């Protein structure tokens, strides 16, 4: 069976090797006689799955020992509440609003603390990023929140801001849901990172949280115990029953990522190199076209989520129908921005980009 290329923004395509391994182990994991779905989360079989997944993610992302890795639930939307419940101490937080997801974050945080919009790119209709030097950060803020890749608008911070040089003593919180494990992270600049797994790491159901140890233990009294980072960490992410199968698939994905190689580099360095090449190929094709265009500034274009528009919007439905006929799936853009969107996460092979570009050229020639 030849599988189509799936450009969904999330849940998204998974590495075929991971799906094949999961299928082979579905009824009997490593001779246990059980599917992972059937295991007790406190049994030795699942404990080994969990411990390996945690260790592999730490190694893969080069996470320092003073950070805890938590496997939580609720996705990025829940973290928009869980972060202020744990870090705000009921005081204040600064937000850099660069698109739909960071805007949702600041609105949710207002329920728990005083929120200041330190910077926004709304004036550019979320097609540029506000320069860090222009951010109005408060020295006494509990944390600074940045969504480092906006899935809908297709803008990405190519480098993490160093907010200490901007006069802030607050920890930086990053929502890296849609580009986690696509590039290295400078953990010296981060206090907490969170991301749903369903774009780059696995199926929906598990949320990865990486939190510096000194930031735990300060949850508001109203914070549910299951969302208290220290409680979750002290119980090895098993204070409540974790999403066991989602953790298992994420663990298989971590192993797949560790095996990836591009030239003389492996793991995340290889993925960064591969992702840069894939994105550049697609953006170049869009920029050379007379039919398609991308509105995002070249210096902040996302490597993961590539929105593009047709100059003749009346051809949108024909484009999507033709794409489906060419086994190119889920290219429709988000309803808030329209047009098309190709999400080209880690599992999207170069062949998928080439197939999409080939179809785009064919469609343009036909409708010139």
UniProtKB/Swiss-Prot annotation:
Enzyme Commission number: 2.6.1.52
Superkingdom assignment: Bacteria
GO cellular component: cytoplasm
One MF term in the entry's GO annotations: pyridoxal phosphate binding
Residues recorded as bearing N6-(pyridoxal phosphate)lysine in the entry: 199
Subcellular location: Cytoplasm
Broad EC category: transferase
Reported cofactor(s): pyridoxal 5'-phosphate
InterPro entries found in the cross-reference section: Aminotrans_V_dom, Aminotrans_V_PyrdxlP_BS, Pser_aminoTfrase, PyrdxlP-dep_Trfase, PyrdxlP-dep_Trfase_major, PyrdxlP-dep_Trfase_small
Binding-site list for L-glutamate: 42
Reaction(s) this enzyme catalyzes, per UniProt: O-phospho-L-serine + 2-oxoglutarate = 3-phosphooxypyruvate + L-glutamate; 4-(phosphooxy)-L-threonine + 2-oxoglutarate = (R)-3-hydroxy-2-oxo-4-phosphooxybutanoate + L-glutamate
Pathway(s) where this gene product acts: Amino-acid biosynthesis; L-serine biosynthesis; L-serine from 3-phospho-D-glycerate: step 2/3; Cofactor biosynthesis; pyridoxine 5'-phosphate biosynthesis; pyridoxine 5'-phosphate from D-erythrose 4-phosphate: step 3/5
PANTHER family named among the record's database cross-references: PHOSPHOSERINE AMINOTRANSFERASE
Complex formation: Homodimer.
Similarity remark: Belongs to the class-V pyridoxal-phosphate-dependent aminotransferase family. SerC subfamily.
Name recorded for this polypeptide: Phosphoserine aminotransferase
Organism: Polaromonas sp. (strain JS666 / ATCC BAA-500)
Lineage: Bacteria, Pseudomonadati, Pseudomonadota, Betaproteobacteria, Burkholderiales
């Amino acid at each position: 069976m030849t599988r189509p290329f799936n450009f969904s923004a999330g849940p998204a395509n998974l590495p075929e090797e991971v799906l094949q391994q999961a299928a082979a182990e579905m009824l009997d994991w490593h001779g246990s006689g059980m599917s992972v779905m059937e295991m007790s989360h406190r049994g030795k079989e699942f404990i080994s799955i969990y411990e390996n997944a945690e260790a592999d993610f730490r190694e893969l992302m080069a996470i320092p020992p003073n950070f805890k890795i938590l496997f939580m639930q609720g996705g990025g939307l829940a973290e928009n509440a869980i972060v202020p419940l744990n870090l705000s101490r009921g005081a204040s937080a600064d937000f850099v609003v660069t698109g739909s997801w960071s805007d949702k974050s600041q609105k949710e945080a207002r329920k728990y603390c005083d929120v200041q919009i330190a910077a926004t790119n709304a004036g550019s209709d979320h097609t540029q990023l506000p320069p860090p030097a222009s951010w109005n950060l408060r020295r006494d803020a509990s944390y600074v929140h940045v969504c480092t890749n906006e899935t809908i608008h297709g803008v990405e911070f190519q480098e993490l801001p160093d907010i200490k040089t901007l006069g802030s003593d607050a920890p930086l919180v990053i929502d890296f849901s849609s580009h986690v494990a696509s590039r290295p992270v400078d953990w010296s600049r981060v206090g907490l990172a969170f991301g749903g797994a369903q774009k780059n790491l696995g199926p929906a159901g598990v949320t990865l949280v990486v939190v510096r140890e000194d930031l735990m233990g300060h949850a508001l009294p109203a914070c549910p115990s299951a969302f208290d980072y220290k409680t979750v960490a002290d119980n090895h992410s098993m204070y409540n029953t974790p999403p066991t199968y989602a953790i298992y698939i994420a663990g298989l994905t971590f192993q797949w990522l560790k095996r990836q190689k591009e030239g003389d580099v492996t793991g995340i360095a290889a993925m960064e190199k591969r992702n840069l090449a894939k994105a550049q190929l697609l953006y170049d094709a869009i920029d050379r076209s007379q039919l398609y265009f991308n509105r995002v500034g070249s210096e902040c274009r996302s490597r993961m989520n590539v929105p593009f528009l047709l100059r003749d919007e009346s051809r949108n439905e024909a484009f999507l129908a033709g794409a489906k006929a060419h086994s190119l799936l889920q290219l429709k853009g988000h309803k808030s921005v329209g047009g098309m969107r190709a999400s080209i996460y880690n599992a999207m092979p170069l062949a998928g980009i080439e197939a999409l570009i080939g179809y785009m050229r064919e469609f343009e020639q036909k409708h010139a």
